[in-house]
């Protein structure tokens, strides 16, 4: 997903997710104002045959942490919408049935 030709993981969570700390490895939950279903990116630093996934990083859209409701969200990638760098955008569905297009050019982690 990051464009290096090796498959990565993009995971959707619920509001009560636990994200491992990138330094200590101990899972932690976001403080209440920042809670919400979110998207995590796990870059494959290995190979297709022997994947090694880095610690999950929470996606940001236009510099803000991505949050979708309480109960959960689902995500997929696709070549839809405005494609600026040849890499897929992200489509997210939330608990209310809303669908969001997150353009790749505005995503960071």
Tell where the protein language model's regions lie, with residue ranges.
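Beta-propeller-forming repeat regions
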Residues: 1-109
